[in-house]
């Protein structure tokens, strides 16, 4: 049997945020079995905790219902909060296929309620199919250059003129299936406060409640295009349109086209626990 918990990541109470199933002690499971278990859970991601291979506290494998990811934000944040309940450490180092990700844990009355992660610094480039993407989204243009960032997953960013326009968005999900290995992030806002929606049929997710791996790149995108200064933390509210409000906090350090650090943080709340009879 394998014990698991479900953590609602980027939420301060259950039934909000983005849920992730965290399975413990998974060294006996094959990748194929993990994939089938993730499909059975049918959450946007499930994680599997294994013994570390290097100097970390644990090695983490991340699966959507359809594929394995080298890195993802909300699953790792939820996993760090779940593992924090098993230890009195204030810092954790989780090994992923994108390297070891450090976490700082925040406790209240001994309980882990939030954490921050240092994310991999992404690469970025102009997106090669902007007209087709805009057509699939039902948009005529973007308020920012349409660029794609890679920090494991590939995130493309499209800016809208207002939060109202963002909320009214009804993309053609069948057309979005023509963009393999891509998460489509639409955003609007100003200053420290931003709203986001993410669509990714390619990753088995119609619409995501909270996309932690996109939060850092969005902070970089805004800083590169001089909408915020480097070093300023932004709040990203996501999941409102699907009834799962999620709050992510992101900050990028750097200057111009050089990024030196990316930090993403948020709360997490335990929703359920159980055992898989495998």
UniProtKB/Swiss-Prot annotation:
Membrane-spanning parts: none
Location of the active site: 45
Signal peptide: none
Disulphide bridges: none
Pathway the protein takes part in: Secondary metabolite biosynthesis; pyocyanine biosynthesis
Record bears the keyword Signal: no
Tree of life domain: Bacteria
Isomerase listed as a keyword: yes
Gene Ontology biological process terms in this record: phenazine biosynthetic process
Primary role: Isomerase that catalyzes the condensation of two molecules of trans-2,3-dihydro-3-hydroxyanthranilic acid (DHHA) into the phenazine ring system. The final product is not yet known.
NCBIfam families for this protein: PhzF_family
Protein name, UniProt field: Trans-2,3-dihydro-3-hydroxyanthranilate isomerase
């Amino acid at each position: 049997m394998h014990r698991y918990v479900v953590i609602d990541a980027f939420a301060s109470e259950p039934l909000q945020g983005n849920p992730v199933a965290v399975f413990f002690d998974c060294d006996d499971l094959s990748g194929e079995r993990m994939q089938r278990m993730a499909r059975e859970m049918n959450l946007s991601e499930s994680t599997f905790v294994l013994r570390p291979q290097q100097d970390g506290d644990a090695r983490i494998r991340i699966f959507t219902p359809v594929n394995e990811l080298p890195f993802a934000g909300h699953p790792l944040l939820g996993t760090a909060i779940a593992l924090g309940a098993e230890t009195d450490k204030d810092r954790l180092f989780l090994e992923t296929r994108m390297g070891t990700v450090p976490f700082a844990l925040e406790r209240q009355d001994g309980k882990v309620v939030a954490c921050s992660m240092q994310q991999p610094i992404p690469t970025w480039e102009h997106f090669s199919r902007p007209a087709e993407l805009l057509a699939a989204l039902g948009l005529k243009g973007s308020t920012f250059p349409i660029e794609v960032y890679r920090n494991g997953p590939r995130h493309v960013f499209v800016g809208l003129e207002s939060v109202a326009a963002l909320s009214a968005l009804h993309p053609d999900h069948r057309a979005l299936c023509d963009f393999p290995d891509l998460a489509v992030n639409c955003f609007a806002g100003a200053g420290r406060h931003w709203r986001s929606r993410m669509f990714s049929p390619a990753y088995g997710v119609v619409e995501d409640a909270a996309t932690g791996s996109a939060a850092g790149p969005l902070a970089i995108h805004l800083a590169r295009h001089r909408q915020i200064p480097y070093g300023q933390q932004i709040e990203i509210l996501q999941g409102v349109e699907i009834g799962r409000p999620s709050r992510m906090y992101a900050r990028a350090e750097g200057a111009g086209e050089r990024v030196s650090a990316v930090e993403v943080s948020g709360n997490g709340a335990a929703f359920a626990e159980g055992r898989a009879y495998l």
